[in-house]
Amino acid sequence: MRLSVSLLALAFGSLVAAAPNTKPRTCGSKPSMEFLAKSAEFAAKEASGELLNSLATIEVETYFHVVASGRTPSQGYLSDAMLANQLRVMNSDYGPHGIQFNLVRTTRTVNANWARDGDELGMKRALRQGGYNALNVYFLGDLGSLLGYCYFPTNASPGSTAFIRDGCVVVGQSVPGGNISNYNLGKTATHEVGHWFGGCFGSGDGVSDTPPQRSSTQGCPSSRDSCPGGGVDPIHNYMDYSYDVCMNQFTSGQRTRIYNMWNQYRARG
């Protein structure tokens, strides 16, 4: 699912020199029909108690890839401290649900074309590491009108295009210490990794304890109820599109869905 950010989107600029951008974000792409069918199947089984996750914890082999146009922060070259803070945010957000990200390796590449997402497949062929149970996060210097995007789990054989593309692409400016006002606390990575686990947006995720929404949340309202009768909107949920400071929760149903998706698609590697 791609996170669009320009008018309904957020233009990328310098980590240091650019003025903070405060435009809202929204999601511009849809999960595949295969994924939606599997989600509906899981929803039915979870509701009946037929399908329950069996793992107590998930440990995720994690690789960070910094892809910049040059060797300065303004060109997307993130420091070790910024990456450490991003990992800390991810573990803080997922840790209460028994999920831990173990950083195995960080790579840094200077390639102006890759840094602006000019050759996604070529970049990932060169940089991707680990099996299908390994999370690869690519921090790019310039995503144009995008804040980030990630691929939902599927039946991907090693070496296939789906296997190579797997992972999350995040604009480097969104990590803690970046300069995007309202979106620089590292929650973009948390949100995108949610898609990697199989989490979807609350308006149609099929999870029983996430109320339906007519549209994604923008900003950080005190309360919102876009679908009267279904419960107030989950504006604090990591899979919504609120400001970073507003995001602080997954539901127990989302945890169950993440574990079931993990068992289905990623646990075997």
UniProtKB/Swiss-Prot annotation:
Glycan attachment sites: 179
GO-annotated biological processes: proteolysis
Enzyme class: hydrolase
The EC number(s) this enzyme carries: 3.4.24.-
Signal peptide: 1-18
CDD domains linked to this entry: ZnMc_pappalysin_like
GO molecular function: metal ion binding; metallopeptidase activity
Pfam family, one: Peptidase_M43
Chain intervals with Polar residues compositional bias: 210-225
Keyword terms of this UniProt record: Disulfide bond, Glycoprotein, Hydrolase, Metal-binding, Metalloprotease, Protease, Secreted, Signal, Zinc
Cell compartments where the protein resides: Secreted
Active site: 192
Keyword Glycoprotein assigned: yes
Region (Disordered): 207-227
SUPFAM superfamilies (alphabetical): Metalloproteases ('zincins'), catalytic domain
Function: Secreted metalloproteinase that allows assimilation of proteinaceous substrates.
PANTHER family tied to this protein: METALLOPROTEASE MEP1 (AFU_ORTHOLOGUE AFUA_1G07730)-RELATED, PTHR47466
Similarity field: Belongs to the peptidase M43B family.
Protein name: Extracellular metalloprotease UREG_07765
Biological source species: Uncinocarpus reesii (strain UAMH 1704)
